[in-house]
Curated annotation (Swiss-Prot):
Function according to Swiss-Prot or TrEMBL: Confers freeze tolerance. Binds to the surface of ice crystals and inhibits their growth. Has low thermal hysteresis (TH) activity, which is the ability to lower the freezing point of an aqueous solution below its melting point. The TH activity of this protein is approximately 0.2 degrees Celsius at 50 uM and 0.3 degrees Celsius at 400 uM.
Organism: Leucosporidium sp. (strain AY30)
Site (Ice-binding): residue numbering on this chain: T65, S147, A234
Keyword Glycoprotein: yes
Post-translational modifications: Glycosylated. Glycosylation is not required for the thermal hysteresis (TH) activity. Glycosylation may increase stability and secretion of this protein.
Biotech relevance: Improves cryopreservation of the human red blood cells (RBCs). Almost 90 % hemolysis damage induced to RBCs by freeze thawing with the slow warming at 22 degrees Celsius is dramatically decreased to less than 16 % when 0.4 or 0.8 mg/ml of this protein is used as a cryoprotectant. The post-thaw cell counts of RBCs frozen in the presence of 0.8 mg/ml of this protein and thawed by slow warming at 22 degrees Celsius is almost the same as that of non-frozen intact RBCs, whereas the recovery of RBCs frozen in its absence is less than 30 %.
Compartments reported by the entry: Secreted
Family affiliation: Belongs to the ice-binding protein family.
Main subcellular location: secreted
Name recorded for this polypeptide: Ice-binding protein
GO terms for cellular component: extracellular region
Effect of S171Y: Has 67% thermal hysteresis (TH) activity of that of the wild-type
Gene name per UniProt: AFP
InterPro entries xref list: Ice-bd_prot
Record Pfam families: Ice_binding
Length: 261
């Protein structure tokens, strides 16, 4: 084999790497505009605090409870003292239904993309119990549920990516904290979870939750990232901070939906 052939094969083997690391980026599409997006409903035990937009589809606005909604005169969105952002529902006026349908479809595509990565770097780590771990970038896979009884650290540079494929549920114990180190970015950490997700009282979560089922953020818990659920999301005096906070002119463009569809 010639030296050129060896070099060519070596370069081909680097495909999909970012700064020498495997690229596991998950594309959220229009769903990236939301702090919380759910198909069946979003509830709050007041007062919760959400930085970013929230939306439900195909559910109607009556399935957004505990927020004290005030609908805008355009009837395309609503507001709430608990939400620094806009609130969308499938029964609001055009073009909101199409905007939400696109976001939900993109969230489902992202879930499937995350579930579709192969050749995990870590399989059944800790037999489903993550205790006092520092997690390096890579693909993690479990065929059952995962519990987190103690703090976790995600260590990697700003381009590093993590994907966690969890066939069962995910639960964080009360007071557990996810910590980022080395420049790690919460938008590059994706959890694809096939069953219910529970973030315990006072616990802190970092990353994007791609959840097949119910997500509960218990009293005093917080999440830096996004919650994209294919069923419902329940907040109990919880905090969600999204990396995307629209400027006023972007809000207006999004209301018109021309920018997104």
């Amino acid at each position: 084999m010639s030296l050129l052939s060896i070099i060519t094969i070596g370069l081909a083997g680097l495909g999909g790497l970012v700064n020498g690391q495997r690229d596991l980026s998950v594309e959220l599409g229009v769903a990236s505009n939301f702090a919380i997006l759910a198909k069946a409903g979003i509830s709050s035990v007041p007062d919760s605090a959400i930085l970013g937009d929230i939306g439900v589809s195909p559910a109607a606005a009556t399935y957004i409870t505990g927020f004290g909604l005030t609908q805008d005169s355009s009837t395309t969105y609503a507001t709430s003292p608990q939400v620094t952002g806009l609130i969308y529902a499938a029964d609001y006026s055009t073009p909101t239904p199409n905007y939400l349908a696109a976001a939900v479809a993109n969230a489902e595509t992202a879930y499937n993309q995350a579930a579709g990565f192969v050749d995990p770097d870590f399989l059944e780590l800790g037999a489903g119990e993550l205790r006092d771990q520092t997690l390096v970038p890579g693909l993690y896979k479990w065929t059952s549920s995962v519990s987190v009884p103690t703090d976790l650290t995600f260590e990697g540079n700003g381009d590093a990516t993590w994907v966690f494929q969890i066939a069962g549920g995910l639960s964080l114990a009360d007071g557990v904290a996810f910590t980022l180190a080395g420049g790690a970015n919460s938008t590059n950490i994706a959890f694809q979870v096939g069953d219910d997700v529970t973030v315990g009282k006072g616990a802190h979560f970092e990353g994007v939750l791609l959840a097949k089922r119910f997500v509960t953020l218990q009293t005093g818990s917080s999440l830096n990232g996004r919650v994209l659920s294919q069923t419902e999301v329940a907040l109990q005096k919880a905090t969600v901070n999204s990396p995307f906070v629209p400027a006023p002119e972007v809000v207006q463009k999004r209301s018109n939906a021309r920018q997104w569809l």
